[in-house]
A protein has these predicted regions:
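Membrane-proximal envelope biogenesis segments
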Residues: 1-219
């Protein structure tokens, strides 16, 4: 009888564990299970982040390399010069797993990566503008006479506009469930899980382009 009871207890424990894993992986917390791709049709979160970060960086380089300029500046509406991937993924996971037809995010397939891309660009818009800037230079000629020279340069300003997770929740008309998921994923107690999931792309991990940078223009 004891052996039977023990066996039943073990089976129940296994069932409970499996049920908990299924529940968690099917909720917004499933994003923490997406560190590894389960099959050839899926990719891990880090792989998706690397791909999309590369696309973002390519856009910055495209602007810098094709828009004619003499000097280049980069500005951000919040003085942040990197993608806050933790926030992007929290919005993504809450949106996908919390909607009426919620799907698990424990693995990322093509359709989900496309949605993640959409959210990433919505939260990290890139624009640019150019303007002339004239500088007056006072020098002396070979005879010691003062001379004034004006130099007009074209300044390229790359503009980064970031949206917060709260702004995205409003834009996407989050339901109560989605907002609850978002708040849970932003709880400080999960910082270690985010760091483990994102690795070098964790919150604040590296600038994509330094502010007030200059480069030789290659555009025409």
């Amino acid at each position: 009888v004891v052996a039977i009871a023990t066996g039943i207890s073990v089976v129940l424990s296994i069932i409970i564990v499996i049920s908990l894993v299924a529940f968690v992986s099917g909720s917004a917390y499933g994003i923490f299970f997406a560190a590894d791709a389960p099959n050839e049709n899926a990719i891990s979160v880090q792989e998706a982040v690397e791909i999309l970060t590369g696309e973002y960086h390519d856009r910055l380089e495209e602007i810098s390399n094709t828009i004619q300029h003499d000097r280049q500046d980069i500005v951000a509406n919040d003085d942040v010069y990197f993608i806050r991937w933790q926030d992007v993924l929290a919005v993504f996971s809450s949106y996908v797993s919390g909607n009426e037809l919620g799907s698990p995010v424990a693995s990322l397939e093509e359709e989900q990566v496309d949605k993640l891309r959409e959210i990433m660009w919505a939260m990290n818009a890139v624009g640019y503008s150019t303007h002339p800037e004239t500088t007056t230079i006072n020098t002396t000629d070979e005879d010691g006479n003062p001379t004034t020279t004006e130099i007009t340069e074209t300044i390229l300003v790359i503009e980064l506009t970031h949206k917060t997770s709260d702004e995205m929740a409003a834009d996407y008309h989050f339901t109560t469930r989605q907002n609850t998921y978002l708040q849970l994923l932003q709880d400080p107690q999960y910082e270690e899980l985010w760091a483990e999931l994102l690795g070098g792309f964790a919150q604040g991990g590296g600038e994509l382009m330094n502010p007030d940078s200059t480069r030789t223009p290659t555009g025409t």
